[in-house]
Amino acid sequence: MSPSDGDFEIGTDGPSVILVGVDDSTTSLRAGWYAAGLARRQGARIVSVFVAPMASFGMSGPGGAALAVAKDEAFRSTAEEMELRAAVIGDELGISITFIAAKGDPFSEICRIADEVRADAIVVGASAHAGHKLIGSLAVRLVRANKWPVTVVP
């Protein structure tokens, strides 16, 4: 295998930038802790990414504006809580954690941010949604993107 066979850097001991996808799920929290431990052992930094999916329906008509404001406030509140949690974990373990919150399609946003921060690896929690067996989970879509090593934490 030659260096031109892929985009992965050869000659390093491990990732220097680990992107971890987070939300409020139990598997996401486990993924965050796994990534934090990996970063501590490897001397890497973490980019913790929270993406709120944007619904394309329900915003028009009576009450649509109020619903949009409520969803935006919930997004901000959740993002602030996650950013604080990330800062506490970073301080506790002595690792650098950058928190990024975004809105949109989780797959597209994680890919975009991973490219921007030049992530060497991605860590996500396994999906518990039954529908993902039909359309594919975020983890499967990230693996199929074939751009980064992806670790899926159960």
Model-identified regions with their sequence ranges:
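Small/aliphatic-rich secondary-structure junction motif
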Residues: 7-65
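A short acidic, glycine-rich active-site loop
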Residues: 66-81
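Short secondary-structure boundary segments
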Residues: 50, 125-127, 154
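Short glycine/serine/threonine/alanine-rich loop segments
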Residues: 44-45, 95, 119, 148
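Short, hinge-like loop/turn segments at secondary-structure boundaries
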Residues: 63-67, 116-118, 140-141
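Glycine-rich, Arg-bearing micro-motifs that act as flexible, cationic patches
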Residues: 121-145
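Conserved beta-strand positions in the Rossmann-like core of class I SAM-dependent methyltransferases
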Residues: 47, 98, 151
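Structural beta-alpha unit
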Residues: 1-13, 88-122
